[in-house]
Amino acid sequence: PKTWATKNGIAAGSIVYINQGDNGALTLSTDRSERDLRVKLDIREKTGDDLIRDIIGCYVGGYRIIEVTSQHMSPAQKKDLHQIVNKLIGPEILEETINKVVIQDLLSSEELQSEKALRRIRTVVKSMIHDSFASLLNNNGDELAMDVIQRDDDVDRLNLLISRQFTEILRTGSVKQE
């Protein structure tokens, strides 16, 4: 309605969000608040890579709360959920029942700094390359090689965080100045 559009400062080209509630009702909003960044994910029988991809997709998509449900969640599914949450920066499992796991991102978007994360990736990767060569030249370089593998997981976590930050920039249309 025109009065609503005028009241909310909406003009041609403005972004308007449409959200569907649990009861099917649609709500219009000019900003996407934190409460709109919740998703329900029915995983049915998914495990392994398929489940991990779904969770990473929700994370990178900027969802702050991911409610994972299944008729009866298997121990393998719960193990996969715990493993992926441990590989992400910010999310934690806040609730776990026989058929539901609630994952919430506890990292404030104001704390996100892409430039620092990119510098950290650069530093870690440079040291990984150096240590990889050192482990090859060293007769007992297995311990150093295992450390390189661990740091690769850290780089993966930072990469996913940066991907999430870019999604946030696209969603909000703004960049926080550091």
Predicted features, each with a name:
Residues 3-16, 20-178:
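Cytosolic, long alpha-helical scaffolding segments
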